[in-house]
Amino acid sequence: MTVYVALLRGVNVGGRGKVDMRELKNQVEALGCSDVSTYINSGNVIFRDRRAASTLTRELEQKLERRVAVRSLAQIRALCKRIPEGWGNDQEQKTDIGFALDEPGELLWHALRKDLKPREGPEWEVEVTARNVNTVRTLRAKMEAL
């Protein structure tokens, strides 16, 4: 079985898109996925399944009524290798990854915080669900531990 992460778009952002993580876990289990767990309240679900990512994306979006990016452990590992080791998300720098929803791939965005205006961030040219680099690295570790 393949280890996947499903990244839901627009979950618990600025008080909108509220989703209970326990209910989310139950909904993913109801689709037949195994070893399901969630990570933080931003719509990250790790699980095992035999189906293809494209099938899971379609079924999850229908069940959850939200846009979802599904990535395998192999894809997350490859992504993490592309991110420069010194890039982080801390007091000095901001690094976000935009997971494309309608096409394969991810977009990396990095800036020094001193160069940013308040509330400034990436402007993606495709529809994405974004996570900061620390979250992505933690998701990889949790996926590897499954």
Each language-model region and where it sits:
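Surface-exposed, charge/polar-rich loops and edge strands
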Residues: 2-42, 46-146
